[in-house]
Amino acid sequence: MAITSAGAGSGIDLESVISASVSAKKAQLQQPIITKQNSTQITLSGIGQLKSSISAFTDILDKLSAPGAFNKRAINITQSKDDPILKVEGKSGASNGQYNIIVNKLAETSRQEGIFDSSTTPLATQDGQLTFKAGDKTFKVDVKAGDTLQDIRKSINSNGDNFGLSVNIVNTADGKAKLVIDSGISGDGKDLTITGDNAELGVFEAGGGVMSQTRAASSAEINVDGNVLKSDTNTFDDSIQDLKVTVLRVSDKDSAGDLKANKVDITTDKTSIQELVQQFVDGYNTLQDKMNSLGKRNTFVGGVKQDDGGALAGDSTTRAIESFMSNLLVSPSQNSGTYSTVFEIGIKMDNKGKLSLDKTKFGEAVDKNFDQVVALFGGEKGLASTLNSGLKEYTKSGGMLAQREDVLNSDLRALTQKTATANAQLTKYEAALRAQYGSLDALLVKMNSSASALATLQTSYQKS
């Protein structure tokens, strides 16, 4: 049934009456739902912000609780920064120490070269195969009848089994083609060998009339405090325990023509460790600030709530997390036999629960009891790991905060259904009002019509 303007017949503004009644009913039905939806969405947003802030802090704790996180080493090498001779990197477990290192020679790959009349003239009249070997690496390349030097070069370089060998062609001044093959494999005794499975491909073999070896493969060699060490590559990995030494060039010579040693000092990297602990302090404070903001209670002015609190105002979750964190900080360490808590090594807490780092006191603790500082923070039962695992109970899939989100999302779905039900009730209510006022309008029209007829009769009677 079409809805028309109520009161059109009687001239009375019944439409305004219906509109006012519907608005009042709408407020009665929908406002509680809207208020609850807004409140639920704000809480859901607050839970999301809290999860994100906790995750940011646990990322820092992941670094602190990782094996070797505090085993940072500062490495100083007496050499030119612009033209370094070697690079030294410390691994987890590296110890402090001092070494005198001389780089005697660098590792080299083997190379073969040969001059061909042309790079575009077919070399093969029949199918065949070339085999390349260097050390324990080998691969094969198919050569087709009619292949040129350029074709063979492309097939070698693009071969999926290629172990790093490279082939290049240099066009010489006399119009010929110089083939240069570099094995890509270094180390004593790992010279490149090339063999062909037919006479035509024999030209690629060293001593086959065209190709010859122009450089032998060799190992890198260094002298560490009088001990000669060799490596197939220019990297000496764990030749010195827990150190990775990469040689870049041969050492410089002194006035007598002898190679000079480069002094390598490895010490505890206090700056790096201090920066790591500062990240812990900053991350802790950032999370505290976020929880304080989210959990801020609403204020009251003249007994009226101002709705100026945080998204989790009055929520017990933030208080529980704050309590867990602060209690863990003051709990005696199970790892360190020297320090009971982090407050003994330079970390301080103010009356608002915020942390700060006394760098001087922390530096002294690292100097005197480095292992105990590491024990306090690191290890399975250290502060970082314990705090990390506890906080992740809140943020993990199926954890406390995820469960809260599930409940809140379920509440929102229920409220959406309530909104649909309220809208249906509102539609029925408006239809009932229009039917009711429509009947009234029709009755008023009849009454007006009857009154008009009586008035006409009365006028006629008076005139007669």
From Swiss-Prot:
One of its GO terms (cellular component) is extracellular region. Signal peptide: none annotated. Its main location: secreted. One of its GO terms (biological process) is cell adhesion. Residues 403-436 form a coiled coil. InterPro entries: Flagellin_hook_IN_motif, FliD, FliD_C, FliD_N. Pfam families: Flagellin_IN, FliD_C, FliD_N. Keywords: Bacterial flagellum, Coiled coil, Secreted. It is found in: Secreted; Bacterial flagellum. Belongs to the FliD family. Homopentamer. Required for the morphogenesis and for the elongation of the flagellar filament by facilitating polymerization of the flagellin monomers at the tip of growing filament. Forms a capping structure, which prevents flagellin subunits (transported through the central channel of the flagellum) from leaking out without polymerization at the distal end. This is Flagellar hook-associated protein 2. It comes from Aeromonas caviae (Aeromonas punctata). The gene is fliD.
